[in-house]
Amino acid sequence: MPLHHLTRFPRLELIGAPTPLEYLPRLSDYLGREIYIKRDDVTPIAMGGNKLRKLEFLVADALREGADTLITAGAIQSNHVRQTVAVAAKLGLHCVALLENPIGTTAENYLTNGNRLLLDLFNTQIEMCDALTDPDAQLQTLATRIEAQGFRPYVIPVGGSSALGAMGYVESALEIAQQCAEVVGLSSVVVASGSAGTHAGLAVGLEHLMPDVELIGVTVSRSVAEQKPRVISLQQAIAGQLALTATADIHLWDDYFAPGYGVPNDAGMEAVKLLASLEGVLLDPVYTGKAMAGLIDGISQKRFNDDGPILFIHTGGAPALFAYHPHV
């Protein structure tokens, strides 16, 4: 794989070292399958998470452009927004977050606790909207207004999921391949598929580094018909920028996100409790709980290609547990 193309893109060091790839012995015994976990939940800024990989590239680009303000958008309990504003605070940048309440709740914990509490600690300028119906356009409108106030804004898309941001997960695929080399013969990788950048970056990287490994994206907000074009679009954009081909099919399971984005379900919450009780690992109700529910059910229903070892990508999100009490 011509990884030298990745060096064409400026990158700000935020993570510092490969995140752990660990065997989960008690969960493996429980499920009757070797299960490993990639601990992107323990990245070092603001309670961790996968978005830091994307922000290494996006914020480097913002600094290159001379920006003094980061603008992004997401749900009130967005992990992406939390990590973006924390990086802004670390770098002395202003940060504006455009937030929506996607589940229409008036529950105090959701509106004030978890990730939302942390946004205040990071001194974020909060802008509320009724809904992020066209987030790219809404972010550009906000950026125009902020620029008129004398700031130099840089827009970071929802989830950090642009081709540039997703380079962080092409690099993650390299990290996984190096950690598994001559140690673990992975059969499958499972990841939550939301804004699609993490999924698409892994798809490009794994196709070239571990072509026999099956990559499954468990959707957290959309049907396969809605999500697949988003992942493919990013997959092709990433490959184009790296002068690579990307022909691997995109595999998605959409059986585990109902009743909708940001709304806990029983299978997801059972997965959260299972990982906590067996391994001391904290998942979340929005992304990783539902993705783990897919992994567990996929084993039960024999949905994977074979019976080999499975790697679960832990993208973070534990701060949201506090926002979803008493569901937890």
UniProtKB/Swiss-Prot annotation:
InterPro entries named in the record: ACCD_DCysDesulf, D-Cys_desShydrase, D_Cys_desulphydr_bac, TrpB-like_PALP, TrpB-like_PALP_sf
Keyword list (alphabetical) reads: Lyase, Pyridoxal phosphate
Q: Which cofactor does it need?
A: pyridoxal 5'-phosphate
From the UniProt record, which GO molecular function terms apply?
D-cysteine desulfhydrase activity
Mark the residues carrying the PTM N6-(pyridoxal phosphate)lysine.
K51
What EC class is this?
lyase
What SUPFAM superfamilies does the record tag this protein with? Tryptophan synthase beta subunit-like PLP-dependent enzymes (SSF53686)
> EC number(s) per UniProt?
4.4.1.15
Gene Ontology terms describing biological process: D-amino acid metabolic process
Catalysed reaction, written as an equation: D-cysteine + H2O = hydrogen sulfide + pyruvate + NH4(+) + H(+)
Q: What does this protein do?
A: Catalyzes the alpha,beta-elimination reaction of D-cysteine and of several D-cysteine derivatives. It could be a defense mechanism against D-cysteine.
Q: Which family does it belong to?
A: Belongs to the ACC deaminase/D-cysteine desulfhydrase family.
Assembly, per entry: Homodimer.
**Protein known as:** D-cysteine desulfhydrase
Q: What is the lineage of its organism?
A: Bacteria, Pseudomonadati, Pseudomonadota, Gammaproteobacteria, Enterobacterales
